[in-house]
Amino acid sequence: LICTFSDVYDGVGMTNFWCLYNLVVYASMLLIKVMGNEGNYIDALMVHKENILSLLRAKYIFFCGLILVPTLLLMPTVIMGKWTLWMILSYALFTIGFQYFVIFQMAVYNKTSIPLNTKFTSKNGVENNYLQIVISLSVFIVPITFVEILQSFLSEMVAYGIMAVIGMSFVITNKLWIRNIYTRLMARRYENMEGFRSSR
């Protein structure tokens, strides 16, 4: 609402920041802990072949659907003429493509169980996992820096187009990189399972 009815954040940098922030904030809070809740019953998941692969694909589809919530909530900024629909759509594609690709890498390295009765916004399991902190910061800082560089050399429409193409390339190839994550996760399964068991 502040972005819609106020001119405080009308600068290019702040516009980019708030749009990307609103789209990636759910994933940065929830998806960054991927496999944390599943650590409570990881032994059961390992019983059947490719259970984890199906789980990762389901999580990806769910979070792609979840992006509709912030996208719809950003529509008043388009109606008021503050932001363009093309900007929001290109950033949404970039988020479900490249940003989710980066965040999903945590499935390989997370090995701390999160109690099933913990709040979603709790910091449980994050305070000692520096990789989660680095990834959380990078999904905010890197895209904003990248789009600022693009916009300094190209028009806004072209910059948004490049962001959309990058995002779409990762969306189209999601089965490949999710399988790669699954393969790497299975290579570390005993180390991760030990971590999940010891942190219950």
Model-found features: residue ranges?
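Short helix-to-coil transition segments within interhelical loops
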Residues: M46-N51
